[in-house]
Amino acid sequence: MEIAVIGNSEFILGFRLAGIRKTYTAENDEKLLESVNSVLADGQVGILVLNSSDMERLPRRLRTTLENSVKPTVIALGGEEGGLSMRERIKRSVGVDLWK
């Protein structure tokens, strides 16, 4: 399983420096949609990381799909994230509450 990161060039830079190879620069809405669909079609991606502001720019239907996705598990970073907490996302993806 691999990690994929989608965002503007500043957002993905740190992930690139940390060794994440699957990074997608999405400076506009069209590129963002294209990148998200590409990652969803890639069976090797287990975790998708994107900026919460980019998550809000996605169409409601796609956002709901991402919020309910188990593979890849979608993590939105930055700002106040609506929807499920990190604990709930991990619990959903592995099937166990790791905090208990």
From Swiss-Prot:
GO terms for biological process: proton motive force-driven plasma membrane ATP synthesis. It comes from the Archaea. InterPro entries: ATPase_V1-cplx_f_g_su, ATPase_V1-cplx_fsu_bac/arc, ATPase_V1_fsu_sf. GO terms for molecular function: ATP binding; proton-transporting ATP synthase activity, rotational mechanism; proton-transporting ATPase activity, rotational mechanism. Belongs to the V-ATPase F subunit family. It is a peripheral membrane protein. The keyword Ion transport applies. The gene is atpF. Pfam families: ATP-synt_F (PF01990). Disulfide bonds: none annotated. Gene3D superfamilies: ATPase, V1 complex, subunit F. Signal peptide: none annotated. This is A-type ATP synthase subunit F. Coiled coil: none annotated. It is found in: Cell membrane. SUPFAM superfamilies: AtpF-like. Its main location: membrane. Component of the A-type ATP synthase that produces ATP from ADP in the presence of a proton gradient across the membrane.
